């Protein structure tokens, strides 16, 4: 029971101001009998005892309440009398035309044996004349056949008796009684009727321009016979109603124009004293005109303007005008061309795919460079040893056979040795000018080679052996061949290309370049990405950003 009341705030009104509940009121009357008091048959105010339930009264109350409830439901609820039609559920004006009730009796068609065939196509025995088919005939019908040609009455036909009716005869058809009227000969014609009158002329038919011999032409009068009273106008040669407006007589007096001092300037540009306001020029102003000066910027009301208060009206603001709140980042007009490979695949993914390949390629290039360096150094040492051995053999031969003449070697003969020095100096200058072509080629080779040259020259202590040294150096042809080897090694740039667009490296294994830069030693490792050298860096770059050189 305590669970049912859990969560509800039960408040009991307590009357603290009253007296003790156990005290009896002074005016209390105990009108409860002993039976009622024992069985609780009467309610005592404040005692907690209630009288017993009267079943008959309760049943009557329930019945009354049920009746009132049903009446309210009938009044407020939908009424069956208002609906399809009538008092008991049917309203005739709203009933469906195709809906029928239980009282509807359908008229069934009669059987063939019950049909009254007197009414039908027409008449008493199955035929009604007003409904019979016009093309249907009965047995009493007698067809009228056409008469033979020998039985036809030709007295009524083209016209009249014996085949011709005059009212229907053709106008152009003539009979044998027709008499044609022939035209008279010229000798039989009456020429008293014709052009006019009795003797060949009808006056009403005569040509107006045709005149006879009785015609008398009226000649024009001479100037001396003319009456000049009628002419330009009036009695003596002038008729005023026919006179030219521009023609003036001797009595005309020209009205001279008034002097400026005599003119009335009250009528003019407008109004009294020279100005008429309705004719005044809109751009003409008088001395009483006061020009309204524009206010200073400090006096102008900037609450009205481009829009709203403080200079901006939103409804009048230019759509293309931006305010100070609209901050746009300044960007260059140059737009980078994004290749298809860069859109479909990112550089980070390609870096992950080709990272190991790039490392292996770099290691392979490093191994190749070291192998070439070792091979070149070994070849140089071998050549130096051969040159040193030849020098020693020549020195021994010269010591064993001294020269007969004291001056077999003049100083002039040493002059050809100078081109050798010049060639060596030019060779070193050429090497220093060319410089390293790729990042993988080592530079210490040239310094070691120079040291070898210096070591070889220091070993040549004898003055007479100088020419032999240069001759032996020129004889095997080592240095020119080595020069061509360096040219081929440094000039072998591999596949080269020219940059069409600028590209910024997105990773450590990529290279950056600007338009018209040259990329050398290109390796086409993929269709979309190549690898090469540019600006001293070796790495990946997009293939569609460059153009191969022929």
From Swiss-Prot:
SUPFAM superfamilies: SH3-domain. One of its GO terms (biological process) is cell motility. The modification Phosphoserine is found at residues 113, 150, 261, 405, 417-418, 426, 438, 447. Residues 357-396 have a biased composition (Basic and acidic residues). Cortactin repeats lie at residues 80-116, 117-153, 154-190, 191-227, 228-264, 265-301, 302-324. Residues 348-401 form a coiled coil. It is found in: Cytoplasm, Cytoskeleton; Cell projection, Lamellipodium; Cell projection, Ruffle; Cell projection, Dendrite. InterPro entries: Cortactin_SH3, Hs1_Cortactin, SH3-like_dom_sf, SH3_domain. The modification Phosphotyrosine is found at residues 421, 446, 453, 470, 486, 489. It is a peripheral membrane protein. CDD domains: SH3_Cortactin. PROSITE patterns: CORTACTIN, SH3. Keywords: Acetylation, Cell junction, Cell membrane, Cell projection, Coated pit, Coiled coil, Cytoplasm, Cytoskeleton, Endocytosis, Endoplasmic reticulum, Isopeptide bond, Membrane, Methylation, Phosphoprotein, Repeat, SH3 domain, Synapse, Ubl conjugation. The modification Omega-N-methylarginine is found at residue 119. Part of a complex composed of NEDD9, AURKA and CTTN; within the complex NEDD9 acts as a scaffold protein and is required for complex formation. Interacts (via N-terminus) with NEDD9. Identified in a complex containing FGFR4, NCAM1, CDH2, PLCG1, FRS2, SRC, SHC1, GAP43 and CTTN. Forms a complex made of ABL1 and MYLK. Interacts with SHANK2 and SHANK3 (via its SH3 domain). Interacts with FGD1. Interacts with ABL2. Interacts with KCNA2 (via non-phosphorylated C-terminus). Interacts with PLXDC2 and SRCIN1. Interacts with SAMSN1 (via SH3 domain). PANTHER family: CORTACTIN AND DREBRIN, SRC SUBSTRATE CORTACTIN. The SH3 motif may mediate binding to the cytoskeleton. This is Src substrate cortactin. The gene is CTTN.
